[in-house]
Amino acid sequence: SAASDVYKRQALTRSDFSLAQSVVADDVLLDAAQRELEERAILTIAKRQPMAQDLREIVGSIRIASDLERIGDLGKNIAKRVMAVHEFGQPVQLTRGIEHMAELALDQLKDVLDSYATRDTDRAEAVRARDEDIDAMYTSIFRELLTYMMEDPRNISACTHLLFSAKNIERIGDHATNIAETIYYIKTGQQIEDERPKGDRTTSMVLPVNAATDK
């Protein structure tokens, strides 16, 4: 899928400027596809007045398309930050964790899209459970980058972009989890009852002043 292709690209860890530009350009395709799907879904509801399973399929497809479109937006934001970080350069050790986190998010996204294709609720629930791993990794990366900024204020600008890139990857995992929950709803007609785990522990941590605002 176009969304999956966006996250196969490791523009951040490779500091690949041209690849980052390509990711930004590809977001337009995702936006257009999402709009087209939504228009078709609304037209189908108006003309055929589907019920039960058929209606859930249509409503679910709208939800999933919205999550994929948002994932595209997050990918575009990461790509723009690659362009900014490219000017500063970044230590390899800081990007390895982010690269691994991105691989986890990509695997999560691939698995949830596969489970949508097969309507496999067990696989969708497994994807949902794995979101904790991405949350835990994000918290670890946050601490590492925060320490790096405190040790040398000259690192603040580059590390801020890396921080927000990591947060965007964590949010991609959240959207994959949303898709998993939608798949469960499509197949069963019920919402998953247990509360989603919340693994982000960074809200109690304090950023350096210059790094506190997203751009």
Tell where the protein language model's regions lie, with residue ranges:
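Short, small-residue-biased leader/transition segments that mark boundaries at the very start
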Residues: A2-Y7
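A structural feature that tracks compact, well-ordered secondary-structure segments
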Residues: K8-R9, A65-H86, V112-Y116, A124-R128, ...
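Acidic (E/D-rich), amphipathic helical modules within compact regulatory domains
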Residues: A11-A32, K47, K80-A84, L104, ...
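Heptad-repeat coiled-coil/leucine-zipper interface motif in alpha-helices
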Residues: S15, D26, A33, L37-R40, ...
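Amphipathic alpha-helix face/heptad-repeat signature
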Residues: L19, V23-D26, A33, E57, ...
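Leucine-rich amphipathic alpha-helices with coiled-coil/heptad-repeat character
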Residues: L37, A41-T44, R48, V82, ...
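Hydrophobic/aromatic-rich structural module bridging two neighboring secondary-structure elements via a short loop
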Residues: E39-S66
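Divalent-cation-assisted or electrostatically stabilized phosphate/pyrophosphate-binding catalytic cores
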Residues: Q49-P50, L55-V59, G89-K110, A117, ...
